[in-house]
Amino acid sequence: TGSVLKKETVSLNAMWGVLFTLILILYMGLRPVSVYFGDTVNYAKGFYTAANSRDPFSWQWEGEWLFYNLMQWFARYSDIHTFFLLCATVYIGSLWLAMQRIFKGYYYIPFLVILSMFTFWSYGVNGIRNGMGASLFILAMTYVNRPPVMIGLCVLAAGIHKSIYLMVGAGTLTWFIKNSYWYLAGWMACVGVSYAIGGRIQAYL
């Protein structure tokens, strides 16, 4: 542990962290469109449908507005690999920046822990919107002392995936309610709601 925390090792890890992050973004973002990457093919199908549409691009504010506006724009003016590269940059880059803000020069090891999670790759190539939204929300939480930035990032995250509204709501509650017993009661209530109408809630999200 001592060698990991040495100044020389920390500097080296920081350098390798940047290089490894860039390589990983390129590797994930420039992947081929294949069924081996889960919903990548479904996103590609929607992308090509938009690319072949004759309707002019117009900004929409409904649903997951940010993600689909970006997809529509890239479908008309760029290509799918550049779009997936942007998605990977947001997904991985937000996590990288969040770890840097939390752990400063010692971010490399925590960042590697995130990359080693079994869900990491899946959220990057399969549940793309989920991964991007969650990463932006994690980054937003590092700006808790700068509310305008935090709120702005939360708005962008929710514009990528609607499930982020749940996390934003939970974060808002912790801002005002400090008594942990209320959270226990809320958790028990959520179990009941999930049992009663969980299917309808999941379908909406």
Regions found by a protein language model. Name each.
Residues 1-24:
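Start-transfer (signal-anchor) and selected internal transmembrane alpha helices
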Residues 41-44, 171-205:
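Alpha-helical transmembrane segments and terminal signal-anchor/GPI-anchor hydrophobic tails
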Residues 41-52, 56-78:
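Short hydrophobic/aromatic helix or loop-helix immediately within or flanking a transmembrane segment
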Residues 86-103:
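Transmembrane-helix motifs of polytopic, lipid-linked glycan transferases
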Residues 99-117:
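Transmembrane-helix signature of polytopic, membrane-embedded enzymes
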Residues 124-131:
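Short acidic/glycine- and proline-prone juxtamembrane loop motifs at membrane-interface regions
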Residues 137-149:
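Membrane-interface transmembrane helices that cradle and orient dolichyl/undecaprenyl
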Residues 149-173:
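Membrane-interface alpha helices of multi-pass inner-membrane proteins
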